[in-house]
Amino acid sequence: MSRAMALSQLLPDVALARDVQVSGLVMDSRAVRPGDAFVAIAGFGAHGLGFAAQALASGASAILFEPPAPADLPVPADAIAVPGLRARLGVLADHFHGAPSQAMRMIGVTGTNGKTSTVQLLAQALTLLGTPTGTIGTLGVGLYGAAVPTGFTTPLVLQTHAELAQLRDAGAQAVAMEVSSHALDQGRVDAVQFDVAVFTNLTRDHLDYHGDMAQYGAAKAKLFARAGLRAAVVNLDDAFGRTLFAALDPALHAIGVSSRAQAGATVQAQDLQLDHHGIQFTLHIGEAAHPVRSPLLGRFNVDNLLAVAGALHALDIAPAQIAEVLGRLQPIHGRMNRLGGAHGAPLVVVDYAHTPDALEQALTSLRSHAQDRLICVFGCGGERDTGKRPQMAAIAEVTADVAIVTDDNPRGEDGDVIVADILRGFARPDAAIVQRDRAAAIHQAISMAGADDIVLIAGKGHEPYQEVAGVRHAFDDAAVAAQALLPRTGLGVRV
């Protein structure tokens, strides 16, 4: 639904030389359409005023900037100085789009691992329960099952509110949203009214940005201190989660979840069993207890299901309904996706695990399902936290029977340097197989696997590309694995 608003209505406290109609708020000059207001603020590499002329040429009706302007950049004659503009962007976007987050039940999910799975599983559950639900996150934006990729885990603040408005206008009654630490630190969810906040876990990642774990955790905690929040769902099996839970505002409906009998947990999984069919457990919510049988693989998916159960409980869904819908949830693309496993072929699992903790969880979980060897194909992304490279190697060496080191997304970094960093983490580097060609590494792993082996292809999950030297080439781990399975099964299809 197209919107338009007088600039004087959007900025009633700012003196305007002339009033104009604004049809959108945009920070990217390349995305400006006629009638949009171009918001020019300082970015990581440049100031938006440097692109004001391009925005005007594309039909921008107004240029908004935060004073003082950089001395080396020209300011268009009609540009409007808005004091504190950056801090006001969320409120302005919320006002412009008619407060979309207040029209839907908003669930924000944060944590190092499990955000995408939890958001997708929660949206799937709510949809099955009859509530049209939108998603915003790594897999894109849209109503559940129809998300369009955007390239962001959490979009920039103007786009966040625009996408919430689109979901509202498309009929969404609820939104499950990934909220990254970057988003919380950079104000990308400013003025979004969350009803429920969910914490999955905190493990090493993004220290190239946050500096240390304390700052990383503090960024995550911001989601739980927001005005208007009604409920918090926290994983009490995580050490930081327990600290976070203890510090919650007493006015919040605090819901602790645990699969390890942590004290204070409202939602628990007990009597856990894992087999080649999936997982089963008894779901306890308060005094209620119901059996759950899920086709999902891996112990960490128990944690994801508990996060979903906690969020549904916060939304006043009955325990019996929660248990029933958990058993109907299907795997998420790129998250412990299963291929093969029949007709004499090994079980192949494609997963997004790209942090030390996620890799350890994936391997440990699959070890519980494995009848024979566990073969791991993994790499590390270029131009990202280098400290996790040897950590992931050590985990693969200890937890898997065979480790094949390959390229992930080298980006602009030398792949040989990345591999050398990884190999430093092996106690016996000579025991690791190095095959930098990712497709060849996947084929090698599957060809060497026996019928009772499990092959984990870790790191890229749902990504349909491999980024090398700044160029994204079409590449899909699951598609390559399916092709490699063909000689073993004649089918190469997912099961």
From Swiss-Prot:
It comes from the Bacteria. It is found in: Cytoplasm. The modification N6-carboxylysine is found at K220. It is an enzyme of class 6 (ligase). A motif (Meso-diaminopimelate recognition motif) lies at residues 408-411. UDP-N-acetyl-alpha-D-muramoyl-L-alanyl-D-glutamate binds at S29, T153, T154, S180, Q186, R188. It holds the Pfam family Mur_ligase. It catalyses: UDP-N-acetyl-alpha-D-muramoyl-L-alanyl-D-glutamate + meso-2,6-diaminopimelate + ATP = UDP-N-acetyl-alpha-D-muramoyl-L-alanyl-gamma-D-glutamyl-meso-2,6-diaminopimelate + ADP + phosphate + H(+). GO terms for cellular component: cytoplasm. GO terms for biological process: cell division; cell wall organization; peptidoglycan biosynthetic process; regulation of cell shape. Pathway: Cell wall biogenesis; peptidoglycan biosynthesis. ATP binds at G111, T112, N113, G114, K115, T116, S117. The keyword Amino-acid biosynthesis does not apply. The keyword Cell inner membrane does not apply. Keywords: ATP-binding, Cell cycle, Cell division, Cell shape, Cell wall biogenesis/degradation, Cytoplasm, Ligase, Magnesium, Nucleotide-binding, Peptidoglycan synthesis. Its EC number is 6.3.2.13. GO terms for molecular function: ATP binding; magnesium ion binding; UDP-N-acetylmuramoylalanyl-D-glutamate-2,6-diaminopimelate ligase activity. Its cofactor is Mg(2+). Carboxylation is probably crucial for Mg(2+) binding and, consequently, for the gamma-phosphate positioning of ATP. Meso-2,6-diaminopimelate binds at R384, D408, N409, P410, R411, G459, E463. HAMAP family: MurE. Catalyzes the addition of meso-diaminopimelic acid to the nucleotide precursor UDP-N-acetylmuramoyl-L-alanyl-D-glutamate (UMAG) in the biosynthesis of bacterial cell-wall peptidoglycan. Belongs to the MurCDEF family. MurE subfamily. This is UDP-N-acetylmuramoyl-L-alanyl-D-glutamate--2,6-diaminopimelate ligase. It comes from Xanthomonas campestris pv. campestris (strain ATCC 33913 / DSM 3586 / NCPPB 528 / LMG 568 / P 25). The lineage of its organism: Bacteria, Pseudomonadati, Pseudomonadota, Gammaproteobacteria, Lysobacterales. The gene is murE.
